[in-house]
Regions:
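Pair of pore-lining "gating" transmembrane helices in MFS-fold secondary transporters
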Residues: 3-25, 219-239
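Hydrophobic core of transmembrane alpha-helices in multi-pass small-molecule transporters
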Residues: 18, 84, 96-113, 234
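Extracellular/periplasmic helix-loop-helix junction of adjacent transmembrane segments
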Residues: 25-58
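Intracellular juxtamembrane helix-capping segments at the cytosolic ends
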Residues: 33, 111-126, 133-134
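Helix-to-loop junctions at the C-terminal end of transmembrane segments
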Residues: 57-70
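C-terminal ends and interior cores of transmembrane alpha-helices
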Residues: 79-93
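Glycine-rich segments within core transmembrane alpha-helices of 12-TM secondary carriers
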Residues: 126-150
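Helix-loop-helix hairpin linking two adjacent transmembrane segments in secondary transporters
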Residues: 141-191
Length: 239
């Protein structure tokens, strides 16, 4: 396998994560949906459903990625996410049931499929810069929310100019295209590959420290690190 410039992986990761930030841009649609007769609880239900499917499918994606490969999983996520928004637009953009299914369930599932890929691939291509690459990928996820809020709202005024239906349709096409393009670079490096000049760290006893020792789900749940990280996320999300 020919080893290409690994920074293309970063480009692909950022493109994918920018599109996936759509889930946190949902609030920009709330005023228009309320004007169309929705209650605040209905808008929150779609968002909560999206987060639920995002979390559940993300676990599934992590399990199937070694078998199918990261490119297929990320592109599947792009197709599912984009299709969800496209269908939401085609069904009028204001139907609660349609948006709950197409954006909450299908869109959330698409985000879950694609989310794990850039981080997993990026860390394998950059064992020497894991923190940097993970930070860049996740920051794209956060910035994507701001980008889509501004595009639909104050910058692009898509909702004001074209309405919810057209906005959902346009965003669906954009999300699908961005993730499909970014997915082109989502492949793992060759087995045993390391960047030039990088050597695996050495433990105090002289043995090489590698990333080959993996925990299964049961073993992971028994580690104190898992529970500490879970508490950190729980308190952070609550804040």
């Amino acid at each position: 396998m020919k080893v290409r410039n690994r920074w293309f992986v970063v480009l692909g990761a950022v493109l994918i994560q920018l599109a996936l930030g759509a889930i946190y841009a949902w609030s920009v649609f709330t005023p228009s949906l309320v004007d169309a007769g929705w209650t605040k609880a209905m808008t929150q239900a779609v968002f909560a459903t999206g987060l639920f499917f995002f979390a559940v499918v993300m676990v599934i994606a992590g399990r199937i990625m070694p078998k199918l490969g990261p490119r297929k999983v990320s592109m599947a996520g792009g197709f599912v996410l984009g299709s969800g928004y496209l269908l939401a637009g085609l069904f009028g953009g204001t139907s609660f049931i349609a948006l709950l299914i197409f954006i909450g369930m299908i869109g959330g599932a698409g985000i879950g499929l694609a989310y794990v890929v850039p981080i997993a691939v990026g860390m394998r291509w950059f064992p020497d810069k894991k923190g940097l690459i993970t930070g860049m990928a996740v920051s794209g996820f956060g910035f994507g929310a701001t980008l889509w809020v501004k595009l639909a709202g104050s910058w692009g005024s898509l909702i004001a100019l074209y309405g919810l239906s057209t906005t959902f349709t346009a965003l669906g096409a954009i999300f699908m295209l961005m993730i499909l393009v970014g997915g082109i670079w989502m492949i793992f490096p060759p087995e045993g590959w390391l960047p030039a000049g990088y050597t695996l760290p050495v433990a105090s006893d002289g043995s090489t420290i590698s990333d080959d020792n993996h925990f299964n789900s049961t073993e992971m749940l028994k580690t104190p690190q898992f529970h500490l990280i879970s508490m950190t996320f729980a308190f952070g999300a609550s804040a």
